[in-house]
Amino acid sequence: MHRYRSHTCGALRDSHIDQTVRLSGWCHRIRDHGGVLFIDLRDHYGLTQCVADPDSPAFAQAEKLRSEWVVRIDGKARLRPAGTENPELPTGQIEIYINEIEVLGPADELPLPVFGEQEYPEDIRLKYRFLDLRREKLHQNIMTRGAIVDSMRKRMKEQGFFEFQTPILTASSPEGARDFLVPSRIHPGKFYALPQAPQQYKQLLMMSGFDRYFQIAPCFRDEDPRADRLPGEFYQLDLEMSFVEQDDVFAAVEPVVTGVFEEFAKGKPVTKNWPRIPFAESLRKYGTDKPDLRNPLLMQDVSQHFRGSGFKVFARMLEDSKNQVWAIPGPGGGSRAFCDRMNSWAQGEGQPGLGYIMWREGGEGAGPLANNIGPERTEAIRQQLGLKAGDAAFFVAGDPAKFWKFAGLARTKLGEELNVIDKDRFELAWIVDFPMYEYNEDEKKVDFSHNPFSMPQGGLDALNNQDPLTIKAFQYDITCNGYEIASGGIRNHRPEAMVKAFEIAGYGENDVVERFGGMYRAFQYGAPPHGGMAAGVDRVVMLLCGTTNLREISLFPMNQRAEDLLMGAPSDVTPKQLRELHIRLNLPQD
């Protein structure tokens, strides 16, 4: 018999009755029922009930065991007594009568419980992550993550992609988020950077004659904490393709993403035919560029009904052509208590309030707005929104460029409060036609809106002759249930177009050469048309595991202060290490 086990703790069935077996694992739970000890023994594969009564030769040893001790148990498999079977366990028909116990690893008193899923302070969970990972839900999430990554790889290869690994030590770029810098010992005063993404390398691969690349790429960004991203590092399914247009990328990616979601959705419906929603339309209907399409509430422009009306606040706003009034339908929300609650919520979000109209049983409108604009305008709004008695509508007004984010939050809040969001499906969509540029109010200049390497729609002609703020890019995102899970674009592969694109954003050709010299040089030697994207592995796994916390799907994450509490990082280093790197510390004074 093997030194530690003949079977795993999830393997034994009623077909193993009367066999002598050996199991090794952790003491998950120990119970004393009238002098009979029941030990639930757990390993990676499952859990088996083991029994020692006073007649067992191992009873004295069993009495010494405590939670999370690692033990080897020898014994005989037998059927559980009638009525004590556990249908929730694959091993629930049998138990092991213990003949011998060997303690392989005793455990100190636990700083957090492994048995059960009770909430515990996050810092304790992260400091003792090796214990936290023994808990069933988190353990299963990590296993699911591995299976999802395997599925991604398999499906990418089925689409003709080949996996490459790009460098981890690369050059720093001042664009985007802050880099994690790595000092060079051999080149004093110079630094490598950990890649924020393999963007330039994957484009260089296309210029090197490769056709379809992918990798599960680690990415590093020295960003301030964000709720939707782990500090420090994250992983993405990165891909690039040569000689493609936007539709070719969509055709290659959709089967991969749809297939992964269908495989791990646990029966929940997954979008078959992805809609393509222009960026401007997404803001207009949903108040966000990552809409949750499970929410059926759609915003509409109702400016015409308030222009010249008796509600002077909106009427005066609409004298400025850039201002609009948007309505968010609230089916079933036509009570004063509900409308007042939404108004209070808006004030809590820093807004002056949230205007509303309610429709009574007779069909007449009620509320301050209805009283000011009159029954005809109120009825016209009801008909436009398709509402009925007992419903309400909520209104935001002003410059859409300034209020669309709040309008999107209000739409989401209404969907949640009215319980109209179907939580049991995955709604995937493409968001397309992103603006190439945006106006930076702080610096009073035109900036890139998203990826600076994207191809402008209309090419060099658009860059030369069009108002930059009207140029759209071949840039696209994948959204799912209110999250952006992937982003990409067709690349600007012509050097003259690349230089012009950066010039509009305030960078000269010398800046381009200095910051992106390797790729710019490659453009001079025959660059194919190419495009690609990257999908956030962490967010995909988070959605499929049914959690909203990225730490629940990551092995050893940092806390929100970018600290690894288990390993003690970041940490001090020795003066000798600093001298070797020619670094002297100049720390802020407390």
From Swiss-Prot:
Q: Which CDD domains match?
A: AspRS_core (cd00777), EcAspRS_like_N (cd04317)
- Major subcellular location class: cytoplasm
PROSITE patterns in alphabetical order: AA_TRNA_LIGASE_II
Query: Which Gene Ontology cellular-component terms appear in the entry?
Result: cytoplasm
Concerning InterPro entries, the annotation shows: Aa-tRNA-synt_II, aa-tRNA-synth_II, aa-tRNA-synth_II/BPL/LPL, Asp-tRNA-ligase_1, Asp-tRNA-ligase_1_N, Asp/Asn-tRNA-synth_IIb, AspRS_core, GAD-like_sf
User: What Enzyme Commission number(s) appear in the record?
Assistant: 6.1.1.23
Could you name the domain of life of the organism this protein comes from? Answer: Bacteria
Q: What family does this chain come from, according to its entry?
A: Belongs to the class-II aminoacyl-tRNA synthetase family. Type 1 subfamily.
Q: Kindly state which reaction or reactions the protein catalyses.
A: tRNA(Asx) + L-aspartate + ATP = L-aspartyl-tRNA(Asx) + AMP + diphosphate
Its top-level enzyme class, in one word, is: ligase
Q: How does it assemble?
A: Homodimer.
Task: Indicate the annotated site residue(s) for Important for tRNA non-discrimination.
Answer: H33, G83
GO BP of this protein: aspartyl-tRNA aminoacylation
> What name does the UniProt record give this protein?
Aspartate--tRNA(Asp/Asn) ligase
Region: Aspartate; residue ranges are 199-202
What does this protein do, in the record's words? Aspartyl-tRNA synthetase with relaxed tRNA specificity since it is able to aspartylate not only its cognate tRNA(Asp) but also tRNA(Asn). Reaction proceeds in two steps: L-aspartate is first activated by ATP to form Asp-AMP and then transferred to the acceptor end of tRNA(Asp/Asn).
Q: Where in the cell is it found?
A: Cytoplasm
Keywords assigned: Aminoacyl-tRNA synthetase, ATP-binding, Cytoplasm, Ligase, Nucleotide-binding, Protein biosynthesis
Annotated L-aspartate binding sites: E175, R221, H450, R491
Q: Name one GO molecular function term.
A: aspartate-tRNA(Asn) ligase activity
* Residues the entry annotates as binding ATP: R221, D222, E223, E484, G536, V537, D538, R539
Which SUPFAM superfamilies does UniProt cross-reference here? Class II aaRS and biotin synthetases, GAD domain-like, Nucleic acid-binding proteins
